[in-house]
Amino acid sequence: DEQRAKELFEKGRKLAKDGRCAEALSPFQESLRYAEGVGTLLNLGNCYETLGKTASAHRSFLRAAEVASRNDDKRKDEAKERAKSIEREVSSLLIHVPINLKSSAEIRVDGEIWPKERWDVPWPIDPGVHDIEVIAPPRPKQTESVTVKPHGDKADWAVLTRDPATSPVPPPKSDRPKPDAKETGEESSPQ
């Protein structure tokens, strides 16, 4: 519904103008559900960029350029320029998946499925802490948090190649101190 999209866009724009970009995200995103507008995508990208979410901003600007191009909108060049201007600031996450798990593993990042086309390639992601979960039965679930830094960081993370539960375990260490030579009756000769 175009009217609802416009109302939400105006609400988001007012919040953004008041310096409340975090609050403006929701109305902009909801507006896009009703109608995908170039202005909404550009404003959403501006807010993401202000909040340091460079991968999300880049995606919004690229999408704005696509929509503008499709609709013969003069803002196409602006959207392309905005995307290009932050390209080097976009951080990425590279998740290495061993070949023996490629057919059975499911990977989630921040609770969302990480599709196989993202495996083993650097993928744009916003800076911050990201929770990674690997489910590959019969192995136990592997979970870990990875911090992706801002300003074009390239974070790497690898799925364990072996099941930690079945990996060889070193023998337990004894709590008893080793006996010295006097206790064992073995004296060293003074040679």
Kindly give the residue locations of the regions a language model identified:
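Acidic, Pro/Ser/Gly/Ala-rich intrinsically disordered segments
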Residues: 1-191
